[in-house]
Amino acid sequence: LKGVQFIKKHEKYLVVMVFGAVKSGKSSLGNFFAGKYFVDSDIKTEYLNREKPLFVSEESGRNTGGLSTDINGRTWFTEGPTDTTGAIQYFTLSGLRWIDSPGTGALEKEGDTVNMEDMVNEYIPYADLCIFLLNSSEPGLLEDMKYMEKLSREGQESLVVITKSDIVEDD
């Protein structure tokens, strides 16, 4: 029933769901596409001419890590160093509905009302396209490989994006 309601609610949009392990940069990537890093910039971009996207929480599974408001009153996905997002949340940009999700492998926190990974798995089939983020500092995690195999097996349209490759760590 929830799936039917979700599909009906979002049917006139291209639904892109971003998911991946904790610390892979899902919310940061969403905020980038929504224009967070351009709206106050001196760089002239299309974001200056558009209405700011409306951010909405679809389903929350914890009391923290949903949407947050900056000092200018603009709403964005909450970003943090690890295991921050606790909701299925989205914004709409023209005909695109960008869905942010909790990290796979998220640890249960006190007060969680649902398992974060179960929530992610429930919403994957509803997306027109899944963008699966892999953190370059943790390549080849078994869980990541399982998700890539699942996407392939189920015929889910998907892209794999390697994140944080611009950050060099000294060993």
Question: Which functions belong to the PLM regions below?
Answer:
Residues 1-101:
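Conserved G1/Walker A P-loop phosphate-binding module
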Residues 8, 112, 140:
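Residue-level marker of regulatory loop/turn positions in helix-turn-helix DNA-binding domains and
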Residues 71-72, 101-105, 130-135:
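Short, basic, glycine/proline-bearing loop/turn elements
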